[in-house]
Every structure is written in C-alpha cells, then in structure tokens.
Regions:
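Short, exposed beta-strand "edge-strand" segments with a Pro/Gly-rich flavor and a Y/T-containing core
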Residues: 1-7, 84, 144
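Class I S-adenosyl-L-methionine
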Residues: 45-218
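Conserved Class I SAM-dependent methyltransferase catalytic core
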Residues: 3-58
Length: 218
C-alpha cells in the first residue's frame, strides 16, 4: 500500500463477495498484500487454487536497495468443492512442432540405436503461469489499468459464456470491457466518480475491436 488515495484495502469487501453465489475470484496484488490479508481470505472461506505472475515490460522501484519490481501477482481463489467450480483451461497458440534426433547410445548402456522422431505438439498449449505482456504505461486511463489481453483469458477460465462477472473495484472498466468482448455480462462498482464516468463512457462506445486485446499472452 502507498499514500495514494485510491491505494487502500477496503475492509469488508471479501465478506460482501462471499455473501453472493460467486465461487471464483481473481485478485491482483503484491505478495505483501496477500500475506497481510491472508487471514481475511481464510475467514471468508476463500481457498487459493493457483497463482499467475504478470511480467510487465517495465517496472518500478520505490527503494534503491531492492530489486526492480516488474511483475504483479494474480491469485485465483474459490469457494466450495473444487469439483463444482466452473473452470475452462485456457491455451495460447504458441506451441511449436519439432523434430528431434536421438543419438545411438554407447554399448554399455544397452542396444538402443539412433533414430529420429517428430512431435506434433504445435498449435495450442496451456496458458503458462507467467504471462509476459506490456503494461498500460503511457496509455492508461487509471493508475492500475490492466490490458484486455491479460484479463480476457482469466475471465474465460472462471465464467461460462453468458454468465455475469463482477468487478468491485472496476476503475476505468477494463475487466468489464474484457467481459463483454468474451461474451459475458458484467457489473462494475467504482467509488471514485471520475473513473466511474470513464468506465461508463468506455462501455457505451460498444468497442468490439480493441488494440489491447490483440496482445497475446505468452
């Protein structure tokens, strides 16, 4: 947390979300934030299933005696039995088919001769836990705005087509736009009126093609 007015942990939001029928939750933040509030997640029965690291093209460092921070954590939490939680594993189209040659083994290791085989694993592969994608630096409408290309696969993973996603801190509306682009409905909550107006204007423009969405996660 910093001294910035919008950089605050809002007490009670985990309880409010837990009171709904929501079973999946993606949460962005620093490791420090998650450690400081671990008991609050546990008290509201949110269990962590996995973590994603968003590696940005640039970073920031508030301290000269620490490493330069170029990443952000994205943790997935769920409630209830894991078997009943909707999940649609996401893929990226960057697997590469390859041909490998096997060398003949020396006699003392057994009689396995040389050979050649081709693996046909080109095409889609599971989304990696480290996602490299440019931040919105220089283009952002909100200090913590996320790229659509990062949010879209996270939404598709936790919500079936046509379902409603809720962003209780929607900022300029990136998650809401990503939800619409992926065939979902969306509800956003934003306490800062200027950002709420930006989000409303953004969604009213009915953007179906977005330059940010073209950035593939890799």
């Amino acid at each position: 947390m910093t001294s910035l007015p919008w950089d605050r942990w809002q007490n009670g939001w985990l309880e409010a979300v837990a009171d709904s029928d929501i079973s999946s939750l993606w949460c962005f933040g620093s490791m420090r934030m998650f450690l400081e509030h671990a008991q609050e997640f546990a008290a509201t029965r949110w269990k962590m299933s996995q973590d994603v690291v968003w590696e940005k093209h640039n970073g920031s460092s508030f301290h000269a005696d620490r490493v330069r921070r170029v990443h952000e954590h994205v943790l997935h939490f769920y409630r209830g039995p894991w078997s009943k939680v909707w999940k649609q594993p996401q893929t990226t189209p960057d697997a590469v088919a390859k041909t490998a040659r096997r060398k003949a083994r020396p006699p003392h290791m057994g009689d396995i001769g040389g050979g050649e085989f081709t693996s046909y694993d080109g095409g889609p592969r599971l989304l990696r836990s480290v996602v490299r994608m440019r931040s919105m630096h220089g283009r952002a409408r909100h200090p913590t705005e996320k790229p659509i290309g990062l949010l879209a696969p996270l939404i598709r993973y936790v919500a079936a087509p046509g379902e409603t996603i809720i962003d209780p801190f929607c900022g300029s509306g990136s998650a809401l736009e990503a939800a619409l682009l992926t065939g979902h409905r969306a509800i956003g909550i934003e306490s800062h009126e200027p950002y709420a107006e930006i989000a409303a204007l953004r969604l009213s423009q009915n953007i179906f093609l977005n330059d940010n969405y073209s950035g593939d996660a890799s």
